[in-house]
Amino acid sequence: MTTHRDAFHPRLTNPAPIVRRPPSFGKDDAHIETDLIVIPTEDGHSWDGMIFRPRHGAVDPRLAVLVIHGSVGNYLTGMPRRLAFHLAQEGYAALTANTRMANYGVFFGTGLIDRAQLDIAGAVRALRERGFGRIILLGYSMGSTMVSQYQAVHEPPEVVGVCTIAHPLSLPQSLRRRWERFGSIPSYNEMCTIISRQMEGGDDPERDRIIIVRRATGPTEHPEDAEIWTYRTWWKSRGPEALSAESRRWVGLLRVPLALIQAADDPLIPQPEGALLATLAQEGGCPEVHLEYIEGANHTFDGHELDAVDATIQWVTDLARRARAVRRRLRIRIG
């Protein structure tokens, strides 16, 4: 674990075995309530979101966690759903929100990662309008990069921390490494050449086209090992000039506490990348950095989902506790 007190010693977590069962609807959700909302953006889009909150006994009624999904994910599947559900069970409000990168956005040209900042801004605004004055940004996988950039660039006063799960150092680098491992068709360099030629060095949506990459996620020519992009969505999020997709560029600009909860056996993100992100954040001036590896977990935390959730909730709880202590001291001084 890396914290502000112990800067360079990652801790491999190996919790005692716990007997767990799937959530039982009508029982486990009896103490939470949900609110389906629509989140408008400044450029005229709107995205779905759902607020999960404790029915009674919120730890901090003005604190909310904003959860942002990963690649081809959405607000109600996989890790975002688990995080929001369990956060609410533990007394924290959570908004899990779609962005233009959700689902098939990158397949059909709308998933431009540099514009996703408007989607996160819309979600922050939605929480602000509902009375939440303290917000923790929480991103999974690609969502980690998105929330890191948003906080680094915009620094909204409501945000008190950034929590990231399976945080890549560089989305372009991760994809290139995977394509080279499986021998993608086209290769990374060939993809750059194709897009540069077809787009003529510009960003005209009229020139955008769908492109299929074979052997992108596995070693066969079968459809399940292929990826679908458009010229623009790939170039913006995985191309060599995709600055929005480079977390190593953003973490050093964070001025709120940062958590890096990484999978110890992630085939997409080697362990040294988490350590490097922690170092870059600390050297850049981030006030607190927490680095934790979930032993035995892959990128999607298969079989270890609740270990990642537990680590997240522990960090959120510690951060909320310290924030309450600071507010109490301020009230005493003012009084």
Residue spans for each PLM region:
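Catalytic histidine-centered segment of alpha/beta-hydrolase-like enzymes
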Residues: 297-308
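Conserved alpha/beta-hydrolase
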Residues: 82-105
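The serine-hydrolase catalytic nucleophile loop
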Residues: 72-84, 272-273
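Conserved alpha/beta-hydrolase "acid-adjacent" motif
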Residues: 267-276
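Primarily recognizes the serine-hydrolase "nucleophile elbow" in alpha/beta-hydrolase
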Residues: 132-194
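Short beta-strand/loop motif that positions the catalytic acidic residue
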Residues: 254, 260-262, 266
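Alpha/beta-hydrolase active-site loop
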Residues: 109-130
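N-terminal cap/lid segment of alpha/beta-hydrolase-fold proteins
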Residues: 3-58
